[in-house]
Structure formats: structure tokens, C-alpha cells
Swiss-Prot record:
Protein species of origin: Methylophilus methylotrophus
Molecular function GO terms recorded: ATP binding; ATP hydrolysis activity; ATP-dependent DNA damage sensor activity; damaged DNA binding; single-stranded DNA binding
Binding site for ATP: G66, P67, E68, S69, S70, G71, K72, T73
Pfam families: RecA (PF00154), RecA_C (PF21096)
Protein name, per record: Protein RecA
Family annotation (PROSITE patterns): RECA_1, RECA_2, RECA_3
Predominant place of localization: cytoplasm
Cellular compartment(s): Cytoplasm
Keyword DNA damage applies: yes
Gene name tied to this protein: recA
Amino acid sequence: MDDNKSKALAAALSQIEKQFGKGSIMRMGDADIGEDLQVVSTGSLGLDIALGVGGLPRGRIIEIYGPESSGKTTLTLSAIAEMQKLGGVAAFIDADDALDPQYASKLGVNVPELLISQPDTGEQALEIADMLVRSGSVDIVVVDSVAALTPRAEIEGEMGDSHMGLQARLMSQALRKLTGNIKRTNTLVIFINQIRMKIGVMFGNPETTTGGNALKFYSSVRLDIRRTGAIKKGDEVIGSETKVKVIKNKVAPPFKQAEFDIMYGEGISRLGEIIELGTNLKLVEKSGAWYSYNGEKIGQGKENAKEFLRENPAIAAEIEAKIRDNSNVLADSMTAARSEDD
């Protein structure tokens, strides 16, 4: 670049910084830009690996969606618990009015320190979220759920009134405001969403999420969570087998998937994941129903192997460390088949 151009550029950059503040424009090679992405664990070892960066990225919008009772709230409460372990402040905007403090406590959430809001309208919920983000003092904000963000006009109107597209416009406007503040304050914002069926779809995926398309575009990560089976102890159902697909990922390659168990009253089974992922990497040997580690049997059947690791946390930590060291190998094997709607 010649001297005249360099001087003109320097003058323009100086004027921009003077008018809009320091850091409003910078070169990609500057030190501040190259900082490592900060993440918080999801509470699932396999999902952290599938996300490619070790967890959910801060300063971004995350959407978690799936059918009813698929584990959406469990996953977000696990992320809240992980953030609190790091000393972070968490807020839960409960538009569904369905948060169970006792269940949250069982998942490791520090309930007395959790900020909770049960807003009357969608506008109020999103305004509260924006104010919390702008404060810069909250590390994670969860909105549960987008489907329950009812616009004020709909609440104040008659039961049969038509309010076509009102919620979608509300979400679009709110996300335009939120995005910049979320990035500036490095806050992690998670929206839980529900699934609806598109009417008249003959080909392709008839499923869609509520609240219009804005959230799909503004989200850096979109997770599709599904219950794939039941875990039984005799005739009693004690948990559910769960699969999570990374449908969208702006911080790492997408279309990975993770599978884990959600145990009722316990949450995501960390020890179950250690056994499964360890077996996949041949760190844990499986012969018939027996599991072995370093040539020593640790249990017959998965539940007994989990009990062994529960009683021997040092061995569990050792296997987990080896799994993390081989996370690239695991990530390559986690690629999910793309659906027609992805």
C-alpha cells in the first residue's frame, strides 16, 4: 500500500475509533482478535468433543431443540451447573413456569445462587434477558422456552384473535438487539425451543422449530436432542438413552453427534460416557458382558462397571484424561448423517 493510501487509512481508523470508541475497528492480526474461544462444558463429555471446541462457546447464542421429554432442560441445567463450578453467575428465564428447583439441585445446580425470572409476556422475557446481558455481570442466560414467549398483544387479545407472525417478529427484533451485547459482554445465551409439524409437507422433513427463522440464523450452535430408548432396571425405567446432533456450528465443523444416558434424578451419566467412549477408543476392553481396564476386570455389565468407577474416582479421572487426549480421533467418528432439513 502506498504512503497516501496508508495515511488515508490511518486517518479513517483514527476517526472511527474517536467517534465509536477504541476497539470498534481493528485488524484481524491484532492480538485481541486472536484470543482463544472461551467455552463452558455441557456436562456431557461426548457432546463437548462433538462440539469441536470442548463445550458451548461464550459470547454466542445457542439453540437447543427437540420433542417433549427429550432432555432439553436437563442439558441446559447441566451447562448452568458447569458454569457455576467455574464461579460464574447464571440466570434462568422460565417462560414455561416449569423449572423444578429440586431436580435442578440434583443435577448440581447451586439453586440458592441461581437467578430466576418468570415473565408475564414474551417482550418482558426478552427485555429481562437483554438487561442481564448488558449488565456484563451474568455469565449464562437460559430462556425456556421460545414457544412460551407469548407476545403482549396475544395475551391481551381475545382467544380467537389472529396474530400471524407476531412471535417471529418479536424474536427477530430481540435477537438484533441481543447479538451485539452478547458478543461484547461474552455472555452465553441458550434458547430452548420446541418442535412443531409443518402442514402439508409431502417430501423432506416436516418438523420445524417455533419462533420463526431468526433464531436459526443468529445461533452459532444448534443442537437437536432426541430420546432414543429407555434404560431399565428390571421392569423399572431408570433413565433414557439420548442422542444429540450438532445441526449447526459456527466455531467448529458441524454434523457431529453424541450419545449418552440421562439417569432420572441424576442427570447426564458421566461415568456411563467414560465407559462407552473408553470402549470406543479401546482404552476399556469389553469381552462379552465384562469390562476391563489395564487388564483388570472392573465389572460385569455397564451398571457394575459404573459402580466400580464411582468407587474409584482416580481411575475414572485417568480414563477421562486419556479420552480427552484422543478427542480428535473420537470427533472423526462422530459424524452424523445429514437430514434434508439441515
